[in-house]
Amino acid sequence: MGRRKDLFFLLPLVIPLAPVMNPSRSLLSTPNRRIAAIAMLVLVVDQISKALVLQFLPNVWEEKTVVDGFFKVVHWQNTGAAWSSFTGKNGMLALIAIVALVILYFSRHHFNSHTLLGQFAFGLVIGGIMGNLVDRIVRQHVVDFIRFYIRLRGGNGEETGFPAFNIADSAICVGVTLVFLMTWRNEHAPKPVESPSE
């Protein structure tokens, strides 16, 4: 019941995306609608995946090995940012996320949003930020659960690997990478040769 009640915290984030649910127009009829639809999809998938982790791995630091020595599903709580930076600054990071969403919204036309790939990338970034923001508002921490690792030699059970992350983190990374690659391609694209005037 508590988890269902938590869903009400999604309303302030979902309401701005409501236009994409208007049945009188196509869901993907405009660039803004396509961006909003992708962001909504990322948000929903991210929150469902985290809810499943909390259901099947209810205890913090609990884990389930999927591929021994390579991949496991974990339940980690992160009150900071990537790589545990700014630990304990959940409120500040939530405020930064809100400011970032506002800035991104008003600067969306600078992110190649006129192209389908640009809209996809922008939607990934927006949805990823929203996914982790919901965590910070509802749970006061971000739930990380995807863990790739390798075992260290010595047989003492120690391991090393990439810090645990989630669907929202992945969406942000992929979106930012796509934006960077598109920007780089546009800057290095050959300029059209002007024909000499007669």
Task: Please annotate each region the language model reported.
Residues 6-198:
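Alpha-helical transmembrane bundles and membrane-interface segments of multipass inner-membrane proteins
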